[in-house]
């Protein structure tokens, strides 16, 4: 199950800074930069038992790799709920305000394709950030 997420200011829960609209998953979407917001991505316990848990060798993109592995590699069925499931404060390891963290996150996302033996363009690390620009609110 996956749905929408909104980011809010750390000190103002009513000030929305980013709206992450997801969509139905279709095979191949990860290669375009799309992925569901990890806090609003839920799977049954059995999926973890069958396909594994988070990789601890990925500092920032362990959530991305897990969703890629479940949805793209193992074709786990998903259902999209077109409503906000999570309201979350800004911050986190891949904070958009730090270029070095964004670059590291995208390199780890690229590596996630290689780990799962899935094809990906070498331009992916440039494509992925641009897919999120329209989510930002001022």
PLM segments and residue spans:
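Solvent-exposed, well-ordered amphipathic alpha-helical segments
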Residues: 1, 6, 77, 128-135
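Conserved nucleotide-sugar donor-binding catalytic segment
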Residues: 3-4, 9, 15-105
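Hydrophobic helical membrane-anchoring modules
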Residues: 87, 91-138
């Amino acid at each position: 199950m996956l749905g929408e997420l909104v980011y809010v200011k750390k000190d103002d829960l009513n000030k929305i800074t980013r709206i992450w609209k997801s969509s139905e998953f279709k095979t191949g979407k990860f290669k375009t930069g799309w992925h569901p917001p990890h806090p609003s991505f839920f799977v049954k316990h059995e999926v973890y038992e069958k396909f594994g848990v988070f990789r601890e060798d990925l500092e920032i993109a362990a959530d991305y790799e897990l969703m890629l592995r479940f949805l793209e590699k193992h074709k786990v069925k998903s259902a999209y709920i077109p409503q906000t499931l999570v309201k979350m404060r800004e911050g986190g390891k891949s904070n958009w305000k730090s270029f070095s963290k964004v670059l590291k996150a995208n390199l780890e996302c690229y590596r996630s394709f290689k780990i799962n033996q899935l094809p990906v363009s070498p331009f992916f690390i440039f494509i992925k950030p641009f897919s999120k620009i329209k989510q930002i609110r001022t």
